[in-house]
């Protein structure tokens, strides 16, 4: 039993509340336990210079954290005048994950700009951000189609992410901050609804792991990703390749 009462292979309670903000084309508030992230998707009628004239779109992402999202206040990166390496890494990870999910040639020469803002952090902020960002992006694409701006809903697959780690020689799913701080091995995995993996980040902290442990961690991550995607699926109706929103505004793993 873990400090928060979960089993080793158990996710924290997860909830997704769509349309959390009024103005973006897509938005949600996603919670992984105490970790809470606002994810938005904004449609910009432009693409980077290197894509102009090529007839395809782009998806990019920004990630930030409120100063008091953590137990001790952190200084805003905008005040420091630079974005840290961790933030750059997470932003790129979110962007890559979203581009895995969408056929960019079918959204026209426009950019979907994803913003993920952590309002409370207790571990797993990047995996929560990716899982929530998919909902924001999918809702934005459905809105574009409904308004007749694009001809299809070019969403290729669901995408979600989860953390796995080795803590006190035990392999655990969806680490909270306490567990993440003590982890011998930390892994973040991004996967799709078809069971494929799009990104795996793994590193040991003064600890080397075996191939058998790696496989066990990947298997556990796949279990968590499957559960997250089952939750995402409740928000959509898919028929003959066409995506529409379901009537649900909020889904939770506890209901």
UniProtKB/Swiss-Prot annotation:
The answer on whether this UniProt entry bears the keyword Cell membrane reads no
What are its E.C. numbers?
2.7.7.56
Identify the keywords attached in UniProt to this record, alphabetized: Nucleotidyltransferase, RNA-binding, rRNA processing, Transferase, tRNA processing, tRNA-binding
**Which cysteines are disulphide-bonded?**
none
Entry similarity comment: Belongs to the RNase PH family.
The chain's coiled-coil residues are none
- Per UniProt, phosphate binds at 86, 124-126
Subunit composition and interactions: Homohexameric ring arranged as a trimer of dimers.
Instruction: From the UniProt record, report the name of the gene that encodes this protein.
Output: rph
Q: Which reaction does it catalyse?
A: tRNA(n+1) + phosphate = tRNA(n) + a ribonucleoside 5'-diphosphate
Q: What does this protein do?
A: Phosphorolytic 3'-5' exoribonuclease that plays an important role in tRNA 3'-end maturation. Removes nucleotide residues following the 3'-CCA terminus of tRNAs; can also add nucleotides to the ends of RNA molecules by using nucleoside diphosphates as substrates, but this may not be physiologically important. Probably plays a role in initiation of 16S rRNA degradation (leading to ribosome degradation) during starvation.
One of the GO BP terms on file: rRNA processing
Any one Pfam family match given in the protein's UniProt record, by short name: RNase_PH
Q: Which organism is it from?
A: Aquifex aeolicus (strain VF5)
Q: What enzyme category does the UniProt record give?
A: transferase
Q: Which molecular-function annotations from GO does this UniProt entry contain?
A: 3'-5'-RNA exonuclease activity; RNA binding; tRNA binding; tRNA nucleotidyltransferase activity
Q: Does the keyword tRNA processing apply?
A: yes
**What is this protein identified as?**
Ribonuclease PH
């Amino acid at each position: 039993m873990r400090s928060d009462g979960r089993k080793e292979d158990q996710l924290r309670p997860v909830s997704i509340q769509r349309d959390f903000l009024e103005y973006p084309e897509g938005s949600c508030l996603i919670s992984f336990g105490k970790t809470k992230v606002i994810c938005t998707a904004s449609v910009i009628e432009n693409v980077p210079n290197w894509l102009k004239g090529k007839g395809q779109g782009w998806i990019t992402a920004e990630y930030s954290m409120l100063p008091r999202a953590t137990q001790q206040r952190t200084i805003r990166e905008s005040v420091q005048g630079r974005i840290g390496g961790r933030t750059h890494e997470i932003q790129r990870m979110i962007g890559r994950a979203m581009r895995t999910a969408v056929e960019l040639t079918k959204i026209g020469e426009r950019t979907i700009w994803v913003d993920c803002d952590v309002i409370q952090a207790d571990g797993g902020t990047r995996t929560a951000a990716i899982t929530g960002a998919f909902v924001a992006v999918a809702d934005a694409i459905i809105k574009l189609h409904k308004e007749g701006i694009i001809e299809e809903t070019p969403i290729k697959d669901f995408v979600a992410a989860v953390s796995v780690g080795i803590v006190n020689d035990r392999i655990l799913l969806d680490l909270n901050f306490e567990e993440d701080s003590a982890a011998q091995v930390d892994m973040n995995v991004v996967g799709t609804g078809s069971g494929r993996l799009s990104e795996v980040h793994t590193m040991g902290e003064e600890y080397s792991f075996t191939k058998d442990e790696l496989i066990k961690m990947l298997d556990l991550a796949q279990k968590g990703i499957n559960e997250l995607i089952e939750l995402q699926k409740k928000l959509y109706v898919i028929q003959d390749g066409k995506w529409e929103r379901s009537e649900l505004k909020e889904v939770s793993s506890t209901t």
